[in-house]
UniProtKB/Swiss-Prot annotation:
GO terms for molecular function: NADP binding; shikimate 3-dehydrogenase (NADP+) activity. Involved in the biosynthesis of the chorismate, which leads to the biosynthesis of aromatic amino acids. Catalyzes the reversible NADPH linked reduction of 3-dehydroshikimate (DHSA) to yield shikimate (SA). It is an enzyme of class 1 (oxidoreductase). This is Shikimate dehydrogenase (NADP(+)). Shikimate binds at S13, L14, S15, T60, N85, D100, Y211. Keywords: Amino-acid biosynthesis, Aromatic amino acid biosynthesis, NADP, Oxidoreductase. It comes from Staphylococcus aureus (strain JH9).
Length: 268
């Protein structure tokens, strides 16, 4: 079977390394490549994918929303998130999914098993936040809060959870067991501070969905304060495993995928 990841730029993507490691571990001769498709060429997506004879593909920035009009069917999770990161091509039909939310929550559950009783704060109200919130709401609905700089961003949300401003989030920070940053603040080249951690409880798990850099500024600050931290590496691995399951109906080798990504990050 043939797979790929599409984006622009895409040369930095670790998806090919991760998926190929999984294929090798499972003894599969499947292929996975990175395809750079600029925005101005995206209208040719059907033609490009057809020529490659792909069985499925991942979509990353900046095409997660742009792909939706080209799909024949969109899964409920992807509709809720307003973004697609996985496409299955079956009998000529393109089916869109979003595995980011379930990928993050599966990883989080492995390091924080008592999610059901956790008070959780999500920073940011973009597509990534929405996907994670919808998935977390299955476990922690009464105790889930999302904070954003502007409240207007919540107008497209159809989820009954607590919605507060970032200013209020700073005030009540000590009340949360887990704080998750889903904003671009702290990504490579972005040193913006999203929130003041002055009131962060020492028992709070501080998380970020970014894994490059391995420790974002908000994670470094929390670690200096003595908090446990959790980055986005597991989310990346688990969302990839979920994509593989959608494409093949097989379980991925999580360990081989994570090891391959870690080796790449360390330059091995």
């Amino acid at each position: 079977m043939k797979f790929a990841v599409i984006g622009n730029p895409i040369s930095h993507s670790l998806s090919p390394v991760m998926h190929r490691a999984n294929f090798n571990s499972l003894g599969l001769d499947d292929t996975y490549e990175a395809l750079n498709i600029p925005i101005e060429d995206f209208h040719l997506i059907k033609e490009i994918i057809s020529k490659k004879e792909l069985d499925g593909f991942n979509i990353t920035i900046p095409h997660k929303e742009r792909i939706i009009p080209y799909l024949d069917y969109v899964d409920e999770q992807a509709i809720n998130a307003g973004a697609v990161n996985t496409v299955l091509i079956k009998d000529g039909k393109w089916i869109g999914y979003n595995t980011d939310g379930i990928g993050y929550v599966k990883g989080l559950h492995s390091v924080y098993p008592d999610l059901e009783n956790a008070y959780i704060l999500i920073l940011g109200a973009g597509g990534a936040s929405k996907g994670i919130a919808y998935e977390l709401a299955k476990f922690v609905k009464p105790k889930l809060t999302v904070a954003n700089r502007t409240m207007a961003r919540f107008e497209s949300w159809n989820l009954n959870i607590n919605q507060i401003s970032l200013a209020d989030a700073e005030k009540y920070l000590a009340e949360f067991d887990i704080v998750i940053n889903t904003t671009p603040a702290g990504m490579a080249g972005n040193n913006e501070s999203i929130i003041n951690l002055k009131h962060l409880s020492p028992n709070t798990l501080m998380s970020d969905i970014v894994y490059i850099p391995y420790k974002t500024p908000i994670l470094e600050e929390a670690e200096r304060k003595g908090n446990h931290i959790y980055n986005g590496l597991d989310m990346f691995v688990y969302q990839g495993a979920e994509s593989f399951k959608i494409w093949t109906n097989k379980d991925a080798d999580i360990n081989s995928m994570k090891t391959a990504v870690l080796q790449q990050l360390k330059g091995e």
